[in-house]
Amino acid sequence: MENKDIRKILPHRYPFLLVDRIIEIEEGKKAVGIKNVTANEPFFQGHFPDNPIMPGVLIVEALAQVAGIAVMNIEEFKGKLGLFTGIDKCRFKKVVRPGDQLVLEVLIDSIKMGLVKAKGVAKVGDEVAATAELMFIMTEEG
């Protein structure tokens, strides 16, 4: 799934669309996305100018966007908005820098009454950069 297809599913846009493409998807069960981290990312201007590091919260947001794509492909949730309700067991294990390619893998644990629970792992190569358990609610509006 290319970026133009992602934009048909997610409401996010530059500079907050953090998924470049989806390389694997099982509707409602799993999705794997790619984020190519470039030196031109706007957050590197301040985080940190002489030592650019991708903010961990944006890695978690990228995982959430991949989870959203897995769920928003289900007919029942097409056109809905996913809003965070919780983040648990979040750990940052590797610094992510310009030039890195983040592989964002999300497994959907459950979907009940629009409440989605998922587990995400972000990797650079074979190294885990971040892990988190994500919860969000599918809604008509914010």
UniProtKB/Swiss-Prot annotation:
Active site residues per record: 47
Molecular functions per Gene Ontology: (3R)-hydroxyacyl-[acyl-carrier-protein] dehydratase activity
Key words of the record: Cytoplasm, Lipid A biosynthesis, Lipid biosynthesis, Lipid metabolism, Lyase
Catalytic activity: a (3R)-hydroxyacyl-[ACP] = a (2E)-enoyl-[ACP] + H2O
Gene3D superfamilies cross-referenced by the UniProt entry: Hotdog Thioesterase
Entry similarity comment: Belongs to the thioester dehydratase family. FabZ subfamily.
Name listed for the protein in its UniProt record: 3-hydroxyacyl-[acyl-carrier-protein] dehydratase FabZ
Species of the source: Thermoanaerobacter pseudethanolicus (strain ATCC 33223 / 39E) (Clostridium thermohydrosulfuricum)
Recorded name of the encoding gene: fabZ
